Amino acid sequence: MFEQRVNSDVLTVATVNSQDQVTQKPLRDSVKQALKNYFAQLNGQDVNDLYELVLAEVEQPLLDMVMQYTRGNQTRAAQMMGINRGTLRKKLKKYGMN
């Protein structure tokens, strides 16, 4: 089970193990581990558009959760994310979330 929490200005991922012990680590550590796993599975294959792949993996759930948090209020969501509302609308359309 994973849960995201804001701890100061750092997003963390809380993991609950089988003994109900909770451990927290920065989200960036989880991203780094996911990339290590991805590279290990490549077996020397070339990769194209890695930046877009990683960005899409993070951006889509970010948009989804922010839109849920703001109850669909795009102006408030854009403000929360620090982006222009037009940019938000473009990103929502890109992921079929409009």
Swiss-Prot record:
Residues 74-93 bind DNA. Disulfide bonds: none annotated. Keywords: Activator, DNA-binding, Transcription, Transcription regulation. This is DNA-binding protein Fis. Homodimer. Pfam families: HTH_8. InterPro entries: Fis_DNA-bd (IPR005412), Homeodomain-like_sf (IPR009057), HTH_Fis (IPR002197), Trans_regulatory_Fis (IPR050207). The lineage of its organism: Bacteria, Pseudomonadati, Pseudomonadota, Gammaproteobacteria, Enterobacterales.
